[in-house]
Amino acid sequence: MNWRYFYKPAAIVITIVLFNINCRSSSKATVDSVEYLNKAASSPDTNKIDAKNQPELNTDHSNNTVPLKNMFGINGYEWNFLENPGSPNDRKHIYEDNMALIKTFSGMRHYLNWNRVETTKGNYTFNPTNNGGWNEDLIYQRCKQDGILVLADLKNIPDWLQNTYPASSRDNDNAPVAYGQSLNDPASYADQARMAFQLAARYGYNKNIDKSLIKVDTRKRWNGDIPNEPLVGMGLLKYIECGNERDRWWGGDETHQTAEQYAANMSAFYDGNMGKLGQGVGVKAADPNMQVVMGGLATADVKFVQRMIDWCRTNRGLKADGSVNLCFDVINYHLYSNNGDVRKQKKAATGIAPELSISGEVANQFVKLANSLPGHPEVWVTETGYDINQESYQKAESIGLKTVLANQADWILRTSLLYIRYGVKRVFFYQLFDDHAGGTSQYATSGLAEGIKRRPAADYILQTTRLMGDYSYIKTISNDPLVDQYKLGNKTMYVLTIPDETNRKASYTLDLGGAKKANIHSLKIGADMMDSKHMNTTIGKITLQVTETPVFVEGLN
């Protein structure tokens, strides 16, 4: 990836000066209600946040019922579930030490390599897979048991499809078509769409499927092997993703797809190009209710999605209600907060705090587009995160006395808090473990766990989930410090953060609407729960020191 370097100022401390305000109590969600009257004024800030990267103040989002825990997904692989270092050849059982880590997160984006489940053309295997001997059934069953949503991302192309290309251009990231086929024709993507049908038939919720269309390979690989069993409607998956970063600009020519070509790809994947590709092709042919997620876009370019919509209007037409017959249910992109700009391919030198990046602006663009469409498809961010190795342009740096790991934790949690403000419905961090422990390249050391222990970022996610995972974001009442209000029924929680990366601190007076006490919850590295303490209020108000680590406050009577 190409990023731009630019200067980053040294850390300084800025103080916020408080104004005394007369607050009026009101139950109305209007500007005269108490929660809108929390105010703070600040001295000049060296890291000014552009207005387009700031949330609107006092805009009520109470119709948004997305729980905060939906912002705490993770990316992972089969071996994260099944590979026990004490018994590396046993892939029939969940490795419970790792599962304890995975349960920290609300969702798992599973990188499902197509070659694992269709090692030879037309022969589908799931338990065990012919490639690797993995038990996909067990992984999905355990995730459902533990309340973890799974997004199965069918990605890369299998060896037999690669082998249709000349040796010099074979790449498992090639577009999912045989060599020489048109990338503009949905029929060229029929092989991948057949694979999608088999996945949706097996793991979806529709049990009324013509069994003659199920093509599970039941042959044993050797004597004593456990054969695959053809199953349908197991009720384990609700979401499936078509590829990964198909808008890539790196790699060979065969790895690239335009927006129109990817729309043709998704049209086949979605419903067999409206059924034109025959039986047993496309997700919706197997389970009409399974949600098809667009492959995460590397460029975070909302225009790419608009071009896909335009292709659908031209090639798939309109529904009876006049809306475009889209080939996706969920809009999906990737964005890593740094001081570059992926949209312009400007090179970065370092990761930066999410609020200082383009993340808010980009999220706003995607959500605005989604809300302009009938049905308002959800917007997800399925890759984001920070490295801990200091050679990476995506690194989290140490700030003041705060370690790199502690700062990674702050920025990870603040990333979730940012995206829920803008209406993104789910976030998945990259990734559970380091891709290359000790590596120095970008994305090599982005793991949120290490060995069988959580890193601080995962500590913060677990603690926040336990405190208020079911709460929904209501509004932001201050931009600096950031003060967000969340609710669950008649309970209210405030989250306060300095949106900076200079070790800045501030005092802030929070009006809790007449509450006699405040319960203040502070994140703690290495713990399962936050530290909590009660403090008396003064006429329902409490003055807090706010830092770049979020603090959580609720009123008590």
Where in the sequence are the language-model features?
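Bacterial N-terminal signal peptides that target proteins for export
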Residues: 2-10
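N-terminal substrate-binding region of glycoside hydrolase catalytic domains
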Residues: 36-228, 232-235, 241-242, 247-253, ...
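Conserved, mostly hydrophobic/aromatic
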Residues: 108, 143, 199, 240, ...
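Noncatalytic carbohydrate-binding groove/subsite architecture in carbohydrate-active enzymes
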Residues: 210-226, 258-412, 422
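Aromatic/acidic polysaccharide-binding cleft in carbohydrate-active enzymes
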Residues: 385-461, 481
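Carbohydrate-binding surface patches
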Residues: 477-524
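C-terminal beta-strand-rich structural cap/linker in extracellular carbohydrate-active enzymes
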Residues: 531-557
